[in-house]
């Protein structure tokens, strides 16, 4: 007889493990600590000690007191008793970390936004490549880590194919200031977070080059059209792309200098090259890595993404004026599928 799996409930996920002690991982650990035990894993010993002894993360969230109930560690084995793992590792380091954890049945909730440069895989595709039989979820939406950690109101998409796991994780992570909305569209939730990183750079360029509010609105709306085309080509649902993890995240990161991608783009628009910025930046700007691989995957899918292509040109050193001229001289067309 087949063995019936136990239906998952919020109590089943009492102990949450968080991979990544950067700003986002630390903020998520603070959320998860509201209803249960949390073990937070990171690489830097000095950060681990600061969290455990002084209850701060001096490198990433220096002004925020971290709940005392969070236990930080630099040993992956300390996560062995956790019943679910939130993964907040930068996209380009995701594979190397996932390969170090056991291949078991504990759900992985992917919280990073991006596309692996070498493979062209979204985070959920990458995780499924390593763990083909493991439950995979995506948590994504309009979130600045500092605001989540300060318990300002936040809503996110939590996507998983397994209904009971999705429902249990929502109950476990929901707190008065952090509200997950359910989705079964894992790819759709993943696409939005990856593409918006690149489009946020574009909006930053508009701000830095002082191209005006009209141009920023055009980038957001036409950028969303590119996100929509790309997502649908990968099998995403349009309703997911218009939700928190797609349009919601796009609007947030295209409108604030709290976004690292927006700030990077603003500096590009002001005339600072990619190389000049890299010398000064200690944190990951995921959109820089995502842009060229996103363009490559889009070309393979025959999806037109002119704004993404423009950002690739700017990162490679082309001037804002030349890239803008190319964008505005493209053949006139209908806004959607209507012919001119």
Curated annotation (Swiss-Prot):
Its EC number is 1.1.1.94. NADPH binds at residues 23-24, 43-44, 113, 145, 260, 286. Keywords: Cytoplasm, Lipid biosynthesis, Lipid metabolism, NAD, NADP, Nucleotide-binding, Oxidoreductase, Phospholipid biosynthesis, Phospholipid metabolism. Its main location: cytoplasm. It holds the Pfam family NAD_Gly3P_dh_N. SUPFAM superfamilies: 6-phosphogluconate dehydrogenase C-terminal domain-like, NAD(P)-binding Rossmann-fold domains. The keyword Lipid metabolism applies. GO terms for molecular function: glycerol-3-phosphate dehydrogenase [NAD(P)+] activity; NAD binding. The active site is at residue 196. Pathway: Membrane lipid metabolism; glycerophospholipid metabolism. It is an enzyme of class 1 (oxidoreductase). InterPro entries: 6-PGluconate_DH-like_C_sf, 6PGD_dom2, G3P_DH_NAD-dep, G3P_DH_NAD-dep_C, G3P_DH_NAD-dep_N, NAD(P)-bd_dom_sf. Sn-glycerol 3-phosphate binds at residues 113, 141, 143, 196, 249, 259-261. GO terms for biological process: carbohydrate metabolic process; glycerol-3-phosphate biosynthetic process; glycerol-3-phosphate catabolic process; glycerophospholipid metabolic process; phospholipid biosynthetic process. It catalyses: sn-glycerol 3-phosphate + NAD(+) = dihydroxyacetone phosphate + NADH + H(+); sn-glycerol 3-phosphate + NADP(+) = dihydroxyacetone phosphate + NADPH + H(+). Belongs to the NAD-dependent glycerol-3-phosphate dehydrogenase family. Catalyzes the reduction of the glycolytic intermediate dihydroxyacetone phosphate (DHAP) to sn-glycerol 3-phosphate (G3P), the key precursor for phospholipid synthesis. HAMAP family: NAD_Glyc3P_dehydrog. This is Glycerol-3-phosphate dehydrogenase [NAD(P)+]. The lineage of its organism: Bacteria, Pseudomonadati, Pseudomonadota, Alphaproteobacteria, Sphingomonadales.
């Amino acid at each position: 007889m087949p063995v019936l799996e136990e239906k998952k409930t919020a109590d089943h996920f009492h102990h949450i493990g968080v991979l990544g002690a950067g700003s986002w991982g630390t903020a998520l650990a603070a959320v998860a600590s509201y209803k249960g035990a949390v073990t937070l894993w990171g690489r830097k010993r000095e950060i681990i000690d600061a969290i455990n002894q002084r209850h701060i993360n001096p490198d990433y969230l220096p002004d925020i007191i971290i709940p005392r109930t969070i236990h930080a560690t630099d040993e992956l084995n300390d996560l062995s008793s956790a019943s679910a793992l939130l993964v907040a590792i930068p996209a380009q380091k995701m594979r190397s970390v996932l390969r170090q954890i056991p291949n078991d049945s504990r759900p992985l909730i992917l919280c990073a936004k991006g596309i692996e440069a070498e493979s062209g895989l979204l985070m959920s595709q990458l995780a499924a490549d390593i763990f083909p039989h493991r439950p995979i979820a995506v948590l994504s939406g309009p979130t600045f880590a500092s605001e989540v950690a300060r318990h300002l109101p936040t809503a996110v998409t939590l996507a998983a194919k397994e209904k009971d796991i999705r429902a249990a994780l929502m109950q476990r992570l929901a707190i008065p200031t952090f509200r997950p909305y359910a989705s079964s569209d894992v790819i759709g939730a993943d696409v939005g977070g990856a593409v918006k990183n690149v489009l946020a750079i574009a909006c930053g360029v508009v701000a830095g080059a002082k191209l005006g509010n009209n141009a920023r609105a055009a980038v957001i709306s036409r950028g969303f059209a590119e996100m929509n085309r790309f997502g649908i080509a990968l099998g995403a649902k349009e309703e997911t792309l218009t939700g928190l993890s797609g349009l919601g995240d796009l609007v947030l990161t295209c409108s604030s200098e709290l976004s690292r991608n927006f700030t990077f783009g603003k500096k590009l628009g002001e005339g600072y090259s990619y190389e000049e910025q890299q010398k000064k930046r200690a944190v990951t700007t995921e959109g820089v890595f995502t842009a060229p691989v996103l363009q490559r995957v889009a070309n393979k899918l025959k999806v037109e993404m002119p704004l993404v292509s423009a950002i690739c040109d700017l990162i490679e050193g082309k001037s804002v004026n030349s890239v803008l001229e190319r964008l505005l001289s493209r053949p006139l067309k209908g806004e959607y599928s209507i012919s001119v």
